[in-house]
């Protein structure tokens, strides 16, 4: 179920202040963040965020196509190593 339109997008407050400081300073640094649930806003375009996936901060460069999505969508939390090999066929 989608979020109500009248509520507006959810963004943690500290993200807005951090993004503002980086824009004012003109630096192109990675903004470390743990809020995977926050929505990507148009003012974040061009910035790079380090989205925490439970292990490390994954760098995510924000483009216009990402606006409206959540940060967590671009930092996968699970690694797939493939299915285990068949032990019976290995013995022979």
Swiss-Prot record:
PROSITE patterns: RIBOSOMAL_S19 (PS00323)
Presence of keyword Ribonucleoprotein: yes
GO biological processes: ribosomal small subunit assembly; translation
Keyword annotations of the record: Ribonucleoprotein, Ribosomal protein, RNA-binding, rRNA-binding
Pfam family, one: Ribosomal_S19
Gene3D superfamilies in the record: 30s Ribosomal Protein S19, Chain A
GO MF annotation: an example: structural constituent of ribosome
Gene Ontology CC: one annotated term: cytoplasm
Transmembrane found in the keyword field: no
Domain of life: Bacteria
Family: Belongs to the universal ribosomal protein uS19 family.
Function comment: Protein S19 forms a complex with S13 that binds strongly to the 16S ribosomal RNA.
Name of the protein this chain belongs to: Small ribosomal subunit protein uS19
Provenance organism: Brucella anthropi (strain ATCC 49188 / DSM 6882 / CCUG 24695 / JCM 21032 / LMG 3331 / NBRC 15819 / NCTC 12168 / Alc 37) (Ochrobactrum anthropi)
């Amino acid at each position: 179920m989608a979020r109500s339109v009248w509520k507006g997008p959810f963004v943690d407050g500290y993200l807005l202040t951090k993004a503002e400081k980086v824009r004012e300073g003109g630096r192109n640094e990675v903004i470390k963040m743990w809020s995977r649930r926050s929505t990507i806003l148009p003012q974040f375009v061009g910035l790079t965020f380090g989205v925490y996936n439970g292990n490390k901060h994954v760098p995510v460069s924000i483009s216009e196509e990402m606006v409206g999505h959540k940060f967590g969508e671009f930092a996968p939390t699970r690694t797939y190593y493939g299915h285990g090999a068949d032990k019976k066929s290995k013995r022979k």
